[in-house]
Every structure is written in C-alpha cells, then in structure tokens.
Amino acid sequence: MTKIYHFIGIKGSGMSALALMLHQMGHKVQGSDVDKYYFTQRGLEQAGIKILPFDAKNIQADYEIIAGNAFRPDNNVEIAYANEHGISYKRYHEFLGSFMRDFVSFGVAGAHGKTSTTGILSHVLSNITDTSYLIGDGTGRGSAGAKYFVFESDEYERHFMPYHPEYSIITNIDFDHPDYFTSLEDVFNAFNDYAKQITKGLFIYGEDEQLRRITSEAPIYYYGFEKGNDFVAHDLLRSTTGSTFKVSYRGQELGEFHIPTFGRHNIMNATAVIGLLYVSGFDLNLVREHLKTFAGVKRRFTEKVVNGTVIIDDFAHHPTEIIATLDAARQKYPSKEIVAIFQPHTFTRTIALLDEFADALNQADAVYLAQIYGSAREVDHGDVKVEDLAEKIVKRVQVVSVDNVSPLLDHDNAVYVFMGAGDIQTYEYSFERLLSNLTSNVQ
C-alpha cells in the first residue's frame, strides 16, 4: 500500500515545497491549512494536491504526518488529536534531516540570501544532472532517480541542526529573529554548530567577520570580492540586463560568467554556487551556460508592468535585505525614481532594528510604510508603532493604508518596490487595481 503524506500547514513555504517534491517522486500527498490565500498554494493546486481545512478527521494512524513548526496542541486541532491518540508525527526539519540521507546533499544557510542562492544552485544543478530540490519560495522538485538534493537550511530556532549535508554554503550571519535569538553571538553559535555537521565542503562568504570565525572539520572555502578569498569575483560589469563578472580560484582564472539578475548580492550568490560546483567536480562550462538562464525565484525581485509602471515585489524584511533590493532596483532602473513601500514584519524585529530599518529605507527616493505585520508567535504590547519608524526616516515618508494607496500616484518616472514578509502584497494588489482604473494594459 502506498504511503500517504499529510502536511499540517501545507501552505508554508518549506512545507509546500516538500509536498510538491514528494508528489513528483510518486507519493500520495495531501495537506491542511487556513482558508486565506498564500502565494505558495498555486503550485499545489496545479499539481492536484488536495488542500483541506484543519480538521481532526484528517489525521489517520497510517499516514506519514509532517507538521509545520508553528502548530501546537493549543492552536491546532490536528496536532491535539494526534497527541491525544498517540499518533506520531514529525516536524518539517526532523523529516528533512532523515530524508536527505539518501542523497548527496547541498545545503544553503545564511541570515539573508538563502532562497535566491538555493534557487540559483537548484536551477544550475538540475539542468546538469537529475536533482531534487526544496526552495524557500515554495518551489519543490522531486525525482525518484535523483542522486543530488539541494535544500534551504533555516537557522530559526536552530531548525537546521538535524541536517548533515555533504556540502553547504553560508551566505552571511546577521542578527535577526530577536523573538528567538538573544544576540549576534547567539546567532553565530547556531551557525557554528551547523558548520560542524558539514562533511565534505563548506563555502563561506569571506568578507563577513562573523563567518570568518566559523570552524568545521570539513574543508572551508571562502568566496567574495577581495583577494584574500579562495574564490574571488572580479571585473564586475553591472548593467540593465544583469551582471557579468570573472571568477578566480586561488589565482587560477575560471572564466567569465553572466547572471540575468541584479545587485551585488546576487553576484556573491552566484560565486558561491560556482565555487561549490567547481569543488564538487562539475563542468564549469555547463555551470556558465545555465547561469545565463536563471529566471529568479518567487517574491525575490519579482517584476510586473502596469500601464508602463514598474512594480517590484520582494520578500525583504530585514535592513540588510532592503539595502540589497534597493541596490538591485537602481542597477536595473538607473534613471528612475525608486519608491519603497515597506511593511515591517513582527514587533520584536521592528523594535530591535528600528534605526537600521530607517537607514536602509533612506536608500530609496521616497518611502511609504504599511502597518506592522505581527507574527502569530507574539503579542502587540504597544511598544512600537510604524509611526516610530517614519519619524526616523529623513527621505519623503508617509504611512498608507491598504484601502488608500493613492498617494503612490504622486510620482513620475518611478519604480515601485513593495517589500515585506507579511501581507504587503495586499497593498501591491490595491495599487495595481488603482492603476487598472487608468488602463487595462497589464504585462
């Protein structure tokens, strides 16, 4: 009898990707979640994967049950039922830790850039050889015959500790998730523990002073722009069609590469992938060829045009990510005004990084702020308001509501960059509807 996988919280980005991967590998998959639409569910619907409302009746003793990390007996009827009846289940990261043992696995960790880098590595490697992968934008691909497995390795609550990949990239270390991590040193300790679990090769951004402290039994390869790294990206040419650059390895030239994405951070992401695939024995000519066709990942600098107005949707919700996204927008649209529409995500992060958010948003030409999107894990004690952030921004700034985004029309020759990890897309859709009243020409 074929095993049935049931996902509690199937619309989560990691969960939906895993569900898609298992489905493509020939397994029977279903899941449950809230009614609210999430961008991840489109892929599930296209695959014909059943999405059910939460209900204790969904839980059967003979199912392989995978539970999202946010769900507990006190907030989910399915978890409560499973606990009451002695029905076992695994958390996402627990399942993944055992699943990857059947593959040569490539992890991508880091405070920022995980999803984009996982996307680049998955795209290139799956075009070279049969590869299964999980990307944090909700994309998953499974193949029963795959030898290689690429996955995103999340540090939140140390979820990456069950993972023991052969190879891993670590893009950076930064203080984030202040609801869990107590300090930058706490974040470092988590990554350092993870690094000790890598068995064959660790690829680290060498210009991050925290990452330079990392130790591992596996060989460590540093990548970056500066000469002190093993893999060095140099002779950069950033244009409106993407980024071209050369890479050298310990003084040996590996050639020129092009990636049709924007921002210095994506050059680094690509360099990490080049280094990993070079060390693990893949043909760099094939790597070079497939980098050229990378089309990006969901909610990372995703563009559309409405009546000649460029709208960019991005998941950026940390100051470092905001800076990178605005840098990418200026690279592609150097002659346009860059208008940022940002929704802070979680009260704890907003309080902890209020000054840093203001500094990052000042990189835009004008800023619009949405109300803070609180996490289900926290309570709003009134300690911070979005107006507190607005007061610290020196550029033109205004707080807008989802019901009235008309102030955004006060710009000519502008690119609108919507950023956030909450429901910022509702503001984006509201703006698109406003523009559609002016025209029906949507590309």
Curated annotation (Swiss-Prot):
<feature type="binding site">
    <location>
        <begin position="110"/>
        <end position="116"/>
    </location>
    <ligand>
        <name>ATP</name>
    </ligand>
</feature>
<dbReference type="Pfam" id="PF02875">
    <property type="entry name" value="Mur_ligase_C"/>
</dbReference>
<keyword id="KW-0131">Cell cycle</keyword>
<dbReference type="GO" id="GO:0051301">
    <property type="term" value="P:cell division"/>
</dbReference>
<dbReference type="Pfam" id="PF01225">
    <property type="entry name" value="Mur_ligase"/>
</dbReference>
<dbReference type="GO" id="GO:0009252">
    <property type="term" value="P:peptidoglycan biosynthetic process"/>
</dbReference>
<comment type="similarity">
    <text>Belongs to the MurCDEF family.</text>
</comment>
<dbReference type="InterPro" id="IPR005758">
    <property type="entry name" value="UDP-N-AcMur_Ala_ligase_MurC"/>
</dbReference>
<protein>
    <recommendedName>
        <fullName>UDP-N-acetylmuramate--L-alanine ligase</fullName>
        <ecNumber>6.3.2.8</ecNumber>
    </recommendedName>
</protein>
<keyword id="KW-0067">ATP-binding</keyword>
<keyword id="KW-0132">Cell division</keyword>
<dbReference type="InterPro" id="IPR000713">
    <property type="entry name" value="Mur_ligase_N"/>
</dbReference>
<keyword id="KW-0573">Peptidoglycan synthesis</keyword>
<dbReference type="InterPro" id="IPR050061">
    <property type="entry name" value="MurCDEF_pg_biosynth"/>
</dbReference>
<dbReference type="InterPro" id="IPR013221">
    <property type="entry name" value="Mur_ligase_cen"/>
</dbReference>
<dbReference type="Pfam" id="PF08245">
    <property type="entry name" value="Mur_ligase_M"/>
</dbReference>
<dbReference type="InterPro" id="IPR036565">
    <property type="entry name" value="Mur-like_cat_sf"/>
</dbReference>
<dbReference type="GO" id="GO:0008360">
    <property type="term" value="P:regulation of cell shape"/>
</dbReference>
<dbReference type="GO" id="GO:0005737">
    <property type="term" value="C:cytoplasm"/>
</dbReference>
<dbReference type="GO" id="GO:0005524">
    <property type="term" value="F:ATP binding"/>
</dbReference>
<keyword id="KW-0133">Cell shape</keyword>
<dbReference type="InterPro" id="IPR036615">
    <property type="entry name" value="Mur_ligase_C_dom_sf"/>
</dbReference>
<dbReference type="GO" id="GO:0071555">
    <property type="term" value="P:cell wall organization"/>
</dbReference>
<keyword id="KW-0961">Cell wall biogenesis/degradation</keyword>
<keyword id="KW-0547">Nucleotide-binding</keyword>
<comment type="function">
    <text>Cell wall formation.</text>
</comment>
<keyword id="KW-0436">Ligase</keyword>
<dbReference type="GO" id="GO:0008763">
    <property type="term" value="F:UDP-N-acetylmuramate-L-alanine ligase activity"/>
</dbReference>
<keyword id="KW-0963">Cytoplasm</keyword>
<dbReference type="InterPro" id="IPR004101">
    <property type="entry name" value="Mur_ligase_C"/>
</dbReference>
<comment type="pathway">
    <text>Cell wall biogenesis; peptidoglycan biosynthesis.</text>
</comment>
